Amino acid sequence: DGDVHEIQMLTNMFASIGSNDLAALKEYLDSNGGNINDYVNAIHYLYNVTPQIFSPDTTDKVRQVNPDTTFSALGFGSGASANSLMAANMSTNVFNEMVGDTSLVEPQYDVVAGHWPTSYNEIVVVLTDNGGVSDFMLYAMGLRDPAELDSMVQQLINDEPIVTPTDGNKTFSYDEIMNVAFKMVNAADYYAFDPTYNVWTDKSSDTDFMRNLVNSGEELHISGIVQPRSGTTATALTPGLYYTPDLTTHLINGPAQTQIVQK
């Protein structure tokens, strides 16, 4: 009594692996090695894989929405900011990966339309406490005209007075949001073989190439819309668009089928 004893969870884990073998480590964790499930709610693996997601409408231009390229002309993208004012007021990331075990987050939210994702190509929309979404998210979803955003960015670059939309605070039905779709491509498919020089060339700056690639890409669609449950003091997900770890796994396995990898 009065003593707290040590549980050698990490010691036993490393002793059972014995080397820098990540596959063995994952197998150990997945098989409840050291009874680790008694001490954690979930084990979530993060991989350096970013889904390449585009607007399905390529009529006027090819618009990448993840990672977002809207502000690349200003010298920053989804991971950095050009000025502190923007950094303090917005994030250019609207897509995020959620935990695989949705039972950990489901009690915090009401499903107001559809359902939580059950397939790798499904995305859930997470609203704010009062049922809203940011205008930046609406541009990414194509519910606001992205040309408006392009115009404001260009005016900022040119140090011109910025003309903002006059129809702010728009509302959208759940059906309008549920009808949103995206296109996803594999990053390995950005490369095409050049037989003249016997090399693979990055074609991501070739508009016609990218338009064809996006048009033939995989479709991602909205499976549901969720909103923080009334009375919930803390939630696991910030407002945005969330895909499951199954999508990441799909992307990891995908390059094995591409020509650049097979060659």
Segments and roles (model prediction):
Residues 1-263:
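Basic-flanked hydrophobic alpha-helices used for secretion and membrane insertion
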